[in-house]
Amino acid sequence: RVVTSPLMSDEELQKAIETDSLWENLVQLADNLNDYSVFHQVINRNSKTNTMEILFVASKLSDVNSYSAIAKKAGLNPVIVDVKCFTLKNAHDNTKFKSINQNTNSAILEISDDENYLMIIHNNTPVITDVFLRQPEKDLISQISDGPINDESEAVIRRYSMQVKQAIGDYEAKHENKINNIQVVSSLKNINSIIPSFKKNLPTTGFSLFDPLEGVAIPSYNAEKTNIDNRSTLAAVIGLAYRKLDVFGYYKF
């Protein structure tokens, strides 16, 4: 999430982080801060309001260990763990879109039973806005099928679209950079039935399923494996693959 804090220099920020006082004051975590792996990045400093915006990402260490254990039980050796929104950014940055002139005028929207957020990449920095849904609303979205949808589901999509529209409007007003296209990432089986409702509510914005393999030459022996309707489900894995791995151990992390 993006949090707002009093304006600080890099040195002041680092001291506040080292004493744990910064995150305790800005972010309410369910557990002890030591139970998380924390990443942060300053997005914007505003001297007029004496504030700054910080991208805050916290991954629970127990979850990381659990996922690593699952991979090991499958006979795999985990070599890298990353936050999903960052892997999606990597995949987006490295995709050669045929229908988009510049990657800078598009955004990523994740729609799922778990996470729902809009990510706009500004100057190589992800600007993330959460979309707030109650569980019954998530259930209604997952039940949408082809054809007319019921009034309850339509109302949920309308509220969802309003949050997306507000996030885009805030970004465009602040940075004077128009967002024309949204790349949708989703593991929902009915996502192709959901997208038309978003297009209806946001008619001036293009919506399409994110295809991280667009522009990629796929060998014939892998063509069948990747010939699926919704390639956005591959985005996180491909984003990880784009990471520059330190295979020779030159750098110590």
Language-model segments: residues:
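Phosphate/pyrophosphate-binding loops at sites that engage ATP/ADP/AMP, CoA/4′-phosphopantetheine
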Residues: 29, 165-181
